[in-house]
């Protein structure tokens, strides 16, 4: 029978519930348990797909095409279980499902209310995510409840998990509550009052925490832990300190050494072998003992919030570990990059242009791609980063001076990038759209496969077939591929059915490492193996760094104005 651990948060948001949940899952997995994680988001959006990265951060995409919370990226990087659509749901999805049932007459004329109809639906969604009472059932499902205790939006979720705990019994559920213990510099002490109050709020809802994870910028002394225990009704051994660390990969060991996994296993009556965290210790050692350092310039549209590129940042660091190098990322707002100042990128060992939507800042990205191409700096373009590299090549090499994307200029005479109107989805169904289609849920999403051209750089990295996750509406225009090929661009991966361009590159006798991919490889990177594309990119960056050092960092070419 599946056991459930519910993780809630209090006082303030962004305490690290996702990292705490993923860390607990990793420890339990190391004990031999089959574990999954489920994220409940209390906003009314159906999914985060149409939300601004500045508001929500990264949208993480699963193999089955779900646009989900960035915490699912942490989950996949910490445990072996892959996330699915069922592992993340929102208030919007719950109400949509309830209202559809009401319209069908499933409630047999009853008045539809938050209790029991909405709360029952939440419980059904949780069980579905855990594969409850199916062949796919897990041993433990860790359920992260988004938001903060006391928020109106979270109340139906908290009531639902309270009911679920009551129905399933005390040995089948456990509650872990994160709270904030601030350090008041003027007083020179940690203050426990906010944690006392949030534990009280939780009890008023009907939930008694089994474990309190106390977030602070330092370890919490025994005296404060004893006080928190007394006023929160949690035994002192259940009051666990979570302090700031320089890498999130230290958190599993931190929680294990304070007995969190033992407490949960005792509460849930789980008889398991001891935890084995050697792989985590090895990982931390690798992060703390790099042999060299590389500097990457990331030219993006959402750089004011680094969470917009969370998986990408982690993928670069994973590749750094595989190459025994510390990766230092410097962010550049693409709106600030112009032909006059792009030469400031010359001091970097590699240039990366990530994905994005809309015309803002696109010309700066095109400048960055051109600068990398002309100065033979290793370049990796992801999604929009591939598209701007294609536009740049079309303008300055293929002679299509007005080349553009119809996303940025619908009337462009040379639409080398255009809207995809038909494609096969991750589940095999044929999807269509046009310029008037809704924004939400109408992109090419999820895992897609394509053939890789033999003899290409991509083939050295991926082999014969590449399968990666996608999230885009626009694609290289098939009508321009021959012209681009004749000018020297290598189209190294195409989908079999639609002939959509998946990877472009420059021949290695022209540029040592210049690759653009339409997909998002960062979503499949793990700290254990990295990702083959990022591993190859950082290896090329290291090689460029060595060569540039030997050549004395030759002066970069300035960009010439193009009429």
UniProtKB/Swiss-Prot annotation:
One of its GO terms (molecular function) is ATP binding. It is an enzyme of class 6 (ligase). Residues 1-270 are annotated as: Amidoligase domain. Gene3D superfamilies: 3.40.50.880, P-loop containing nucleotide triphosphate hydrolases. Its EC number is 6.3.4.2. UTP binds at residues 13, 191-196, 227. GO terms for biological process: 'de novo' CTP biosynthetic process; pyrimidine nucleobase biosynthetic process. Disulfide bonds: none annotated. L-glutamine binds at residues 356, 384-387, 407, 473. Residues 295-547 form the Glutamine amidotransferase type-1 domain. CTPSs have evolved a hybrid strategy for distinguishing between UTP and CTP. The overlapping regions of the product feedback inhibitory and substrate sites recognize a common feature in both compounds, the triphosphate moiety. To differentiate isosteric substrate and product pyrimidine rings, an additional pocket far from the expected kinase/ligase catalytic site, specifically recognizes the cytosine and ribose portions of the product inhibitor. Catalyzes the ATP-dependent amination of UTP to CTP with either L-glutamine or ammonia as the source of nitrogen. Regulates intracellular CTP levels through interactions with the four ribonucleotide triphosphates. This is CTP synthase. It comes from Polaromonas sp. (strain JS666 / ATCC BAA-500). The gene is pyrG.
